[in-house]
UniProtKB/Swiss-Prot annotation:
The record marks 17, 24 as: Transition state stabilizer. It is an enzyme of class 2 (transferase). It comes from Stenotrophomonas maltophilia (strain K279a). Catalyzes the formation of 4-diphosphocytidyl-2-C-methyl-D-erythritol from CTP and 2-C-methyl-D-erythritol 4-phosphate (MEP). This is 2-C-methyl-D-erythritol 4-phosphate cytidylyltransferase. InterPro entries: IspD (IPR001228), IspD/TarI (IPR034683), IspD/TarI_cytidylyltransf_bact (IPR050088), ISPD_synthase_CS (IPR018294), Nucleotide-diphossugar_trans (IPR029044). It catalyses: 2-C-methyl-D-erythritol 4-phosphate + CTP + H(+) = 4-CDP-2-C-methyl-D-erythritol + diphosphate. One of its GO terms (molecular function) is 2-C-methyl-D-erythritol 4-phosphate cytidylyltransferase activity. Pathway: Isoprenoid biosynthesis; isopentenyl diphosphate biosynthesis via DXP pathway; isopentenyl diphosphate from 1-deoxy-D-xylulose 5-phosphate: step 2/6. The lineage of its organism: Bacteria, Pseudomonadati, Pseudomonadota, Gammaproteobacteria, Lysobacterales.
Length: 232
């Protein structure tokens, strides 16, 4: 497998919902910040060539790394939304990354990506002309709420999946999809949604429930527990 895949890591968010004094990607867990764990998981894979970390305009917490695990780490300034930040990252990739090459996008605060999940996504996604995302089947019963807070019905879950990251698409196709969504005033919440607007049907690659995003203090506690178990 060629080491030609770059990963865009949007890290421009302030994490206001978390309620911490720092953006959540800079919170400590197991002796290093969450973003470091995320880069560990991504750059350890031999098919990943480097990372473009998209940071905020006034980010005083970025450690200033220019390499990680012996691979280049570049930075650029993001936008007001995740989609704008991902687009900025795609545009800032090195010229050696061709327009038709696949690029990964992965959440900065999703530090528990497994090598198996990443490898499976790359193996499956690069055989598809569009690309693929990691996702998890919905296993809980889903209720539809009415305006009064009462239950209006139960939704069938058989074909429902929760979108995870990484997500894998060709650089030029994803750039166009994100640009078109922005021009139309549509807020896309993940890269696959932008591609869907283009009439594309990315593949779903089942990923582990352990690939969770740290969005609350309870999530951070969960990740610290994972690290303690891993350490023995």
């Amino acid at each position: 497998m060629s080491a030609a895949i770059w990963v865009v890591v949007p890290a421009a968010g302030r994490g206001t919902r978390f309620g911490a004094p720092l953006p959540k990607q800079y919170l400590q867990a197991g002796g290093q910040i969450l973003l470091a764990h995320t880069l560990d998981a991504l750059l350890a894979h031999p098919a990943v060539a480097g990372a473009m970390v998209v940071i905020g305009q006034d980010d005083a917490d970025w450690p200033g790394w220019n390499e990680w695990a012996g691979k280049p780490v570049l930075t650029c300034i993001g936008g007001a939304t995740r989609a704008a930040s991902v687009l900025a990252g795609l545009q800032a990739l090195p010229e050696t990354v061709r327009a038709d090459e696949f690029v990964l996008v992965h959440d900065a605060a999703r530090p528990n990506l497994s090598p198996a999940d990443l490898g499976r996504l790359l193996e499956v996604g690069r055989t598809d002309p569009v690309g693929a995302i990691l996702a998890a089947p919905v296993r809980d019963t889903l209720k539809r709420a009415g305006d009064d807070g009462g239950i209006d019905g139960t939704e069938p879950r058989e074909r429902l999946w929760r979108a995870l990251t990484p997500q894998l698409f060709r650089r030029h196709q994803l750039s166009r999809a994100l640009s078109d969504a922005a021009a139309a005033g549509v807020e896309v919440t993940d890269e696959a949604m932008a591609m869907e607007r283009q009439g594309q049907r990315p593949l779903l690659v089942e990923g582990s429930e352990d690939n969770f995003k740290v969005t609350t203090p309870a999530d951070l506690d969960r990740f610290e527990f994972v690290l303690s178990r891993r350490a023995g």
